[in-house]
Amino acid sequence: AHLAGVKKIFYSSSACMYPEYNQLDPDNPKCSEASAYPAAPDSEYGWEKLFSERLYLSYYRNHKMEVRIARFHNIFGVQGTWRGGKEKAPAAMCRKVAEAEDGGVIEVWGDGKQTRSFLYVDECVDAIRRLVESDFTGPVNVGSEEMISINDFAKMVIDISGKKLTIKNIKGPTGVRGRNSDNNLIKE
């Protein structure tokens, strides 16, 4: 991009780059932009996002190429994958509820007390546009501050469906205990 004369670039990062130790309490995750260091993401994906942010910021410092970085928090919406194990939690939950027989059971990984926030894709696109048009350089969270436990989310989907279903918590990957977007910086 630099060699081609690009003046501004956008990088889509992820909340997965935040340190695992800041996300152990499901009721009080610490995901402000300033809490990223000391670095300790819980996965290789998180490390890749963190290293890529550093790379883009170095281009800003060394080559004056403007960079805008959004740390996405659980974006969902139409046209999102909803089958095959690669779907986001909202789509997976909706699929499980839709496929369950009325009076049946859906399985939720872990104890269901882990928390997340979810942002609809249209709101995400608006945030990207505003960020790219701004003068702000540096990573910024793009997500909702409305946190919900996975069990409560499952109950909400069940209620909307009109079905009577039981939630069965099972062993399975759960990720960090809590993740929620701290939007103080983006509000400035």
Model-derived features with residue positions:
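Conserved sequence/active-site signature of Rossmann-fold short-chain dehydrogenase/reductase
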Residues: M17-Y18, R68, I75-G77, C124
